Amino acid sequence: MKVESVTKEDTKKSERKIKIAIAKPEDYSNKNVILEKEEELICPVCGSKSIIKDYERAEIVCEMCGCVLQQNLFDVGPEWRAFDHEQRVKRSRVGAPMTYTIHDKGLSTVIDWRNKDSYGKDISADKRAQLYRLRKWQRRIRVSDASERNLAFALSELDRIASKLGLPRNVRENAAVLYRGAVEKGLIRGRSIEGVAAAALYAACRRCKVPRTLDEIAEVSRVDRKEIGRTYRFISRELNIRLAPTNPVDYVPRFASELKLPGEVESKAISILQKAGERGLTSGRGPTGVAAAAIYIASVLQGTRRTQREVADVAGVTEVTIRNRYKELTEHLDIDVTL
């Protein structure tokens, strides 16, 4: 068997030139910044960012030009398969993943509250007293100083608001990252923890295209709408958060679901809003009012009409707003609606 020697020069020539952009902790304008160091692969041939990880062929490939960026890719996932959450929990041999929604990122340990041994048997009274003391000191150790206590309180408040609003996990992670960024830059001083947490959650909702209005967040938080809006503008400026105006289309699925409207109405409303956007009818107008008017028009056209009062209650706007937006959309888009 012939073995060829490989020099350092040959190794350098064979290396793939992959541009890696690592997100800096102070750059919070990118909506995909979830981890402290997140890698982004860019094709060295065409410059595309559309990169596919093909684990079957063990390759990283550019979707646009087909250039193979890396070979012999290792799959770092588990070797077992699970088809539901119960199987996944049963077969997993590691703890929970790291998360930014816990003040210590979920890396510390917790002593179980059940007074049982590894065989499931009850432990003695002496052991129970010892475990009680250990649990007490464990709680104290996890939160060592005032800054950690404040962070733990803020993240619990953030999680409480998110639970009330039914927000998904990625929104909570984004909000936690934004709040930690505000703490690192000293933006909390002189402001309430609840206000900054609510503002971070509002920014995360807009970033993840899961829109919630300031009124909705203020209703479940301990601060008013005015303070949340003022704090949101402040942290957006200081953290360099650039967010596009909220698209009315993003509100349609939620409003249609709450009104129990069929999918045809939702699709029709989205079509109306897309045409309105092309003609500039959504600029300078509240996205919730425009979305509510489009849903009202679509429900009438599809024969599943909802009253203006019903739509207004769900969207959090007045009936006058719906009528004004309704007139604009029907006149400029030549929609014939028979009431």
From Swiss-Prot:
It comes from Methanococcus maripaludis (strain DSM 14266 / JCM 13030 / NBRC 101832 / S2 / LL). GO terms for cellular component: transcription preinitiation complex. Keywords: Metal-binding, Repeat, Transcription, Transcription regulation, Zinc, Zinc-finger. Stabilizes TBP binding to an archaeal box-A promoter. Also responsible for recruiting RNA polymerase II to the pre-initiation complex (DNA-TBP-TFIIB). It holds the Pfam family TFIIB. This is Transcription initiation factor IIB. A zinc finger (TFIIB-type) spans 39-70. Sequence repeats lie at residues 156-239, 250-331.
